[in-house]
Amino acid sequence: MVRRFKPAVKYRRGSRTHGWGRVGQHRKSGSSGGKGMVGFHKHKWSLVMKYGESGTGWPFYGKHGFKQPPTIAIEWRPINVGSLSDIIKELKKEGKIAEEGGKYVIRLLELGYNKLLGGGHIDVPVIVYTPAASRTAVEKIEKAGGEVRIIPLIHK
């Protein structure tokens, strides 16, 4: 479709200020009261009150929350029920899992995992020892005729 009007900038070409006044207007950050959060405690205080949470100045001022020290933070290494079902035969060949009463006994910590999640399907009855498991993972394993036993996780 044919344009009826040229873009405004085409008309402004050749003029020094493109319609923004005499000297240096509409440039850099002087026209906005400073860069970024400059002036939030002075001339931009009304913005803090308008957009901050209930007049407290949050999230503009103060420290919020905390970061756990790495010495006590737990690094989760999860595995899904479906992935566990896929590797059971390989683990049996390697001798990493035992069989007890027709059920495979799997200790996730020895395999390098510390959480069991509920993605996928399982149809083999297993007994899983793990520090943590999701509700759906427990339901799926119990539906297959197995059980999940929660063991304490000792972290450094």
UniProtKB/Swiss-Prot annotation:
Keyword Ribonucleoprotein: yes
Name of one Pfam family that matches: Ribosomal_L27A
Keyword terms: Ribonucleoprotein, Ribosomal protein, RNA-binding, rRNA-binding
Gene Ontology, cellular component aspect: cytosolic large ribosomal subunit
Keyword check for Ribosomal protein: yes
BP-aspect Gene Ontology terms: translation
Subunit record text: Part of the 50S ribosomal subunit.
Role: Binds to the 23S rRNA.
Protein name: Large ribosomal subunit protein uL15
UniProt source species: Pyrobaculum islandicum (strain DSM 4184 / JCM 9189 / GEO3)
Lineage per the UniProt record: Archaea, Thermoproteota, Thermoprotei, Thermoproteales, Thermoproteaceae
